[in-house]
Regions:
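Predominantly late transmembrane helices and immediately cytosolic-facing juxtamembrane segments
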Residues: 3, 22-50, 55, 83-113, ...
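Intrinsically disordered, low-complexity coil segments
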Residues: 13-16, 71-78, 254-261
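Generic low-polarity alpha-helical segments
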Residues: 1, 12-16, 388, 393-398
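Intrinsically disordered, low-complexity terminal tails and inter-domain linkers enriched
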Residues: 4-26
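Short, hydrophobic transmembrane alpha-helix segments
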Residues: 64-79, 102, 131-132
């Protein structure tokens, strides 16, 4: 989102925890919050970051559950709108923490405490998701979001205190931008229901402009491999939550309605979709593409659709189960679309962010877009829609793997011949 060149790789500051350090990270309770090196070796996600992710998935699960209820009660449009707004709050807070931690995580006591406050904020948000969907009462959602954002503001103020020059100015712009945006979010509490989506749209755009403004002169020193790992781990956790939600729905349907025969196609198709979603996301390493702030931010922002669609697949599978056993007041077409449309969106987004940068030739490039189109067509197959979508997704994985293997074999042939000569 910004064309500023990334800063040159720097050595980790003395205050930063590094694998080579013989001093435990918690030995000094308070340390200066300075940038870690972009070229730092063996950088990996920390236990605190993994704990952070797991707590955020609690909020995602609540949003998915309410989306199921909305669609099952034929309030699809309203449910999707509320889901988009709540998911943005969860995703944006997660994303900002992730990039901040990649650049400045020093794992001291104060850093941990402020991060735990952010976790508390997302749990407050999660507690208010049902009221936001059912009563249009966003009080708990806004309060939880503001808690997370003000905690991040405090972290940026720590950076400003620990640095100087352009880096300090960048930190102050971040702190000021994030804090000012919270005033706008509080307006959601006072607007009538019809005005809330419009204010949300404005505030979401303003929030996403803060990094562009803050890093215009001095980009943060995020770590490409660490960022790619963090996004990958969160994708795994979201897909895991999707499997858990769908499994519970199938289990309840079998126990309460004795509908094993009717639910087997949904269960099998759902597993194939989720397995394929995992395979497609991780088929190629992406950290090599994150060479500049512009590329990295576009990639990071695009993951709103990746995460939201991945979680929505699970919600769609629950709707399909409820419709099959007669507990959802929607048609088979609507229930099928609840699975196929987020699946198609996931495939297209992963192709746009990942696959298209590595695929060679028209055949390889066309696999995921064509698969997305075929998955949408599966919507009209009635009770077999989910199974068909799963088979199409699995076929895409098989096709992509075969094409890649054939290209590798063709490239290996001339190389071997050259070596022989």
């Amino acid at each position: 989102m910004t064309t500023s060149p990334p800063p040159p790789p720097s050595s980790p500051s003395p205050s930063s925890p590094t694998p080579a350090s013989g001093t435990p990270a918690h030995a000094k309770p308070l340390r200066r919050l300075t940038a870690r090196g972009r070229g730092e070796a063996h950088r990996a996600a920390s236990p605190l970051e993994l704990f952070f992710d797991l707590c955020f998935v609690v909020a995602i699960a609540q949003a998915g559950m309410q989306l199921v209820h909305s669609v099952a009660e034929s309030h699809t449009g309203e449910g999707i709108l509320n889901y988009a707004m709540v998911f943005f709050a969860i995703w944006w807070a997660w994303m900002n923490f992730t990039w901040f931690a990649s650049a400045y995580d020093n794992d001291d006591v104060l850093y941990r405490v402020v991060t735990l406050i952010q976790i508390a904020g997302v749990l407050v948000l999660a507690a208010g998701v049902s009221q936001a969907f059912e009563d249009h009462d966003f009080l708990a959602v806004v309060v939880g979001y503001v808690i997370m954002r003000l905690a991040l503001t405090a972290q940026w103020l720590r950076v400003a205190r620990s640095t100087e020059g352009p880096e300090r100015a960048m930190a102050l712009r971040y702190a000021g931008g994030v804090a000012l945006c919270q005033i706008g979010w509080l307006g959601l509490l006072f607007l009538p229901d019809g005005g809330k989506p419009w204010l949300f749209l404005v505030m979401a755009l303003l929030e996403m402009c803060v990094p562009v403004y803050a890093e215009k002169d001095h980009p943060t020193s995020w770590h490409p491999h660490h960022i790619a790992e963090r996004y990958g781990l969160f994708t795994i956790i979201v897909l895991g939550e999707t499997i858990a939600a769908a499994t519970i729905a199938v289990k309840v349907g079998m126990e309460e309605n004795d509908a094993l025969d009717e639910l087997l196609p949904i269960a099998a198709g759902g597993l194939l979709i989720i397995f394929s979603a995992w395979w497609i996301y991780f088929v190629v390493p992406i950290h090599g593409r994150l060479r500049s702030s512009k590329e990295a931010f576009q990639w990071g922002y695009g993951h709103y659709l990746v995460f939201a669609s991945a979680a929505a697949i699970g919600a769609g599978l629950e709707v399909a189960v409820e419709q099959t056993v007669g507990e959802a007041h929607v048609s088979t077409l609507t229930a099928s679309a609840a699975v196929t449309l987020p699946t198609a969106l996931y495939l297209l987004t992963v192709w746009a962010l990942h696959s298209r940068h590595f695929k060679v030739g028209l055949a390889q490039q066309a696999v995921l877009p064509v698969t997305a189109l075929l998955v949408i067509c599966c919507t009209f197959l009635g009770d077999w829609a989910v199974l068909a979508a799963g088979l199409v997704s699995a076929l895409a994985v098989a096709t992509g793997t075969t094409l890649t293997a054939r290209m590798a074999a063709r490239e290996q042939g001339p190389r071997s011949a050259t070596q022989t000569v």
